Amino acid sequence: MSRENATEEKTTKPDPIYRNRLISMLVNRILRNGKKSLAHRILYGAMSSTRRDTGKNPLLILRQAMIKVTPDVVVKAKRIGGSTYQVPLEVGSMQGKALAIRWLLTASRKRSGRNMASKLGYELIDAAKDNGTAVRRKEETHKMAEANRAFAHFR
């Protein structure tokens, strides 16, 4: 690792329709087997279904869902003296967004429904309303961090 200069953060290009980086991050996480056009179709279908179901701007709903799902702290297993502790760590903004996107997509994939676009749309709506599997996962993570707060000095 060079001490000369820090590496630049990789930034994703905004998507063509909404001109938003968050949407392109979501598309890149939905992506399976290199089928980016299918990932675009899934996400835009989810956005249109959220617009149809709520009557609001889907970008606002996506942002609300991301805010509600993004964790502040996570627990990380750390081995000290032969025993493993769950050490709570604060999460940076980029890592928090990545975790929120991952949790939203896994929750929508596990959801029962017809197609991925509708499942993702319903998960976004639920997350914006502060319920749903992804929000529950964030709350569980925060509870774990709170329970293991005594081990915070092991950072």
Curated annotation (Swiss-Prot):
SUPFAM superfamilies: Ribosomal protein S7. Its main location: plastid. Pfam families: Ribosomal_S7. It is found in: Plastid. It comes from the Eukaryota. GO terms for molecular function: rRNA binding; structural constituent of ribosome. Coiled coil: none annotated. One of its GO terms (cellular component) is small ribosomal subunit. Transmembrane segments: none annotated. GO terms for biological process: translation. Keywords: Plastid, Ribonucleoprotein, Ribosomal protein, RNA-binding, rRNA-binding. NCBIfam families: rpsG_bact. One of the primary rRNA binding proteins, it binds directly to 16S rRNA where it nucleates assembly of the head domain of the 30S subunit. Part of the 30S ribosomal subunit. Belongs to the universal ribosomal protein uS7 family. HAMAP family: Ribosomal_uS7_B. This is Small ribosomal subunit protein uS7c. It comes from Aneura mirabilis. The lineage of its organism: Eukaryota, Viridiplantae, Streptophyta, Embryophyta, Marchantiophyta.
